[in-house]
Amino acid sequence: MGRGKKMSKPGDGRSGDVPETCRTGGTNENHPKMNGEVVHLGQPKIYSYMSPTKSPSGRPPLQEENSVAHHESKNLGKPTTETRKKAEVEKKRISSATELSVKSSKQRETECNSIGEYFQTKQELTDVQRNTALTPVDKLQSQKMVKNKSQRRKAQRKKSPNRKLTDYYPVRRSCRKSKTELESEEKMRIDELIQTGKEDGMKMDMIIGKGRGVIATRDFQRGEFVVEYHGDLIEITDAKRREASYAQDSATGCYMYYFQYLNKTYCIDATRETGRLGRLINHSKSGNCHTKLHNISNVPHLILVASRDILVGEELLYDYGDRRKSSIEAHPWLKN
C-alpha cells in the first residue's frame, strides 16, 4: 500500500508510426506544431489525417504526393535547417533594405521640407524688414552711434604714434638722374666737343675705289655723337654763287650740304681743305651714320650720329641726300 504510486501503462499508440510533430505536447491533430522542421504550406492539415498504416493504393493521388514530400522533408535533417536559416537571413536582408529605402525617402522628404521652410522664413523676414521702415528717431540714434564709433577710432589713432620711414632710415638724396638731366648733360658734352674741335675714335685712310675715307678706331653705340661736319655756314644765295664757281673747276670736289633751319635754307660749305675729318666721310645710301642739327646759342651745327652700333675698323658712311639729275651726272657714285 505504501510502496508508492503505480506507474500508468504507456499507451498502445506506436511511437514510430506517429509523426514527431504530433507527439510533443499532446495529440492536437488539428493544430500540429513545428519543431525545427520545414513543413510545406500547400496543405498543412493533410499530414495529421494521414495514417502510415494505410497502403499507398488506398490513398488519393494528392495525399500520396503530399506524404512523399513530407517524408522527404523529414529525412533531409540538417540540410533542411540550413536552408531555413538561409531563407530567414535573406528575408531579414530584404526587410532591412526596405526599411533603409523607406528611411532614406523619409529623410529626403524631411530635408526638402526643411529647405522649403528655410526659404519661406527668409522671404518672410525680408518682407518684414521691407515693411518695417526705421522711424526718424531710430535713424537719429543709429547716426549718433556711428558718429561715436568714428570719434572713438579717431581718438585711438591720435593716441597711437604715427611711425614714419624716416624714423628707421635716414634721409638720403637719390643718385638717379631723370631723362631731362641726362639729355642736358649729353648736350653739354657735345657742345664742348664741337667748340673745341675734338675728334676722337676715328682716322683718315685710303679706300680702294673711293680715295680718302674715315675709319672708326673704337666702337660707337647707336645714337652716339660721332663727329661734326665742319665748314662755313652760309645762306642759300651765297651757296648758289659758290657752287657755280666750283663747277668751273673739275678738280674741285663737292663738299656743300644744304639744310632747313627755322624755315630758312642754309648751307655748310666744307670745300676748303682743313684738318677736320667730318668733311672726308664718304657717301652711301645704306650708311652707318646720319646727319642731325645741333643748336648752340641759336647757331645750327651739322653733326653725324651713329645709326647703329659701329665696330672698330668699319668705314664711316652717310647718305648725302642729293638726288638731282645734274648732281648724279656730275658725280655717278651718288647712285650707290
Curated annotation (Swiss-Prot):
Region of interest: Disordered: 1-107, 141-165
Listed Polar residues bias regions: 95-104
SET domain location: 200-321
InterPro entries per record: KMT5A, KMT5A-like, KMT5A-like_SET, SET_dom, SET_dom_sf
Gene Ontology molecular-function annotations: histone H4K20 methyltransferase activity; histone H4K20 monomethyltransferase activity; histone methyltransferase activity
Biased composition annotated in UniProt, kind: Basic and acidic residues: 67-93
PTM comment, free text: Phosphorylated during mitosis.
Catalysed reactions listed for this entry: L-lysyl(20)-[histone H4] + S-adenosyl-L-methionine = N(6)-methyl-L-lysyl(20)-[histone H4] + S-adenosyl-L-homocysteine + H(+); L-lysyl-[protein] + S-adenosyl-L-methionine = N(6)-methyl-L-lysyl-[protein] + S-adenosyl-L-homocysteine + H(+)
Skewed-composition ranges (Basic residues): 146-162
Matches recorded under PROSITE patterns: SAM_MT43_PR_SET, SET
Main location: nucleus
Gene3D superfamilies for the chain: SET domain (2.170.270.10)
UniProt keyword annotation of Membrane present: no
EC number(s) on file: 2.1.1.-, 2.1.1.361
SMART domains reported in the protein's UniProt record: SET (SM00317)
GO CC annotation, single: nucleus
Keyword list, A-Z: Cell cycle, Cell division, Chromatin regulator, Chromosome, Methyltransferase, Mitosis, Nucleus, Phosphoprotein, Repressor, S-adenosyl-L-methionine, Transcription, Transcription regulation, Transferase
GO biological process assignments: cell division; methylation; regulation of DNA damage response, signal transduction by p53 class mediator; regulation of transcription by RNA polymerase II
Similarity comment text for this entry: Belongs to the class V-like SAM-binding methyltransferase superfamily. Histone-lysine methyltransferase family. PR/SET subfamily.
Protein name: N-lysine methyltransferase KMT5A-B
Gene it is expressed from: kmt5a-b
